[in-house]
């Protein structure tokens, strides 16, 4: 997304802030009178017209006012909003930041509160670094479909489908050969290392399977997300929202339950973005990934597209602070025990 000039950013920020408060089209006179804009109304109108030409504002009626488009809301959320809603952060930090409770209980309480305060739906995904694969088997369903059954060290039995696309030259027999190799080499492997370990077996697979790369791709794709503890908070905020189309609700919930918002936003994001953001006709999507000491966590938020991105980003950063503090404390305790 192209960076705007400072003057244009100032006007866009004021328009979005005013619109989120008033939910009406915003005029140049209102910005000058109530929002601290120092330009003349004529200059403001000129800048608003330029923002309209960029697709960031739109005039829907014959009035002189304009409202932000989804593109304008996304630009605001990415570049102009902040993650320092002090009232929200301070109130929750006092309660939760230094709590010695189980981290999952703390995250659950904080996230429930954030979902209630922001009217958004929060999703947390934790990848447990200690889970180990104890058993893995393949069961043929049809010529193009099989099921992988995995047993994990915490007693969970996980099931994953593995499809054979029509454009691939692999067969079920290839998957069975690969499974025999996996059973010999992957048992007692940590789940967080499973994808890496499968890739390391490529030379062995290549000796027995012609299309070994397609086989590896099929298996890796099917086991993505294994060992991740996922929880949705404020589900009702999506279901009951009048600002999200009914036909979009099921699609959004399916994405939240089965996919990574972080990965879904990758195409339109830059590597340097701390929080990935996309705002479109379906809603507003935010995601942050924390990867410290093999503790992979994803925090994602879905809300109506006209939601307050300041509060949402502040909530994400508060959760990040609580999680990283917990990880660092654990590492500190581990190192102290090691040297005691």
Curated annotation (Swiss-Prot):
Keyword annotations of the record: Repressor, Stress response, Transcription, Transcription regulation
Molecular function terms, GO-annotated: DNA binding
Annotated signal sequence range: none
Keyword Repressor carried by entry: yes
InterPro entries, per the entry: HrcA (IPR002571), HrcA_C (IPR021153), WH-like_DNA-bd_sf (IPR036388), WH_DNA-bd_sf (IPR036390)
Example GO BP: negative regulation of DNA-templated transcription
Function: Negative regulator of class I heat shock genes (grpE-dnaK-dnaJ and groELS operons). Prevents heat-shock induction of these operons.
UniProt xrefs under HAMAP family: HrcA (MF_00081)
Family membership noted in the UniProt record: Belongs to the HrcA family.
Designated name of the protein: Heat-inducible transcription repressor HrcA
Species for this entry: Mycoplasmopsis synoviae (strain 53)
Lineage: Bacteria, Bacillati, Mycoplasmatota, Mycoplasmoidales, Metamycoplasmataceae
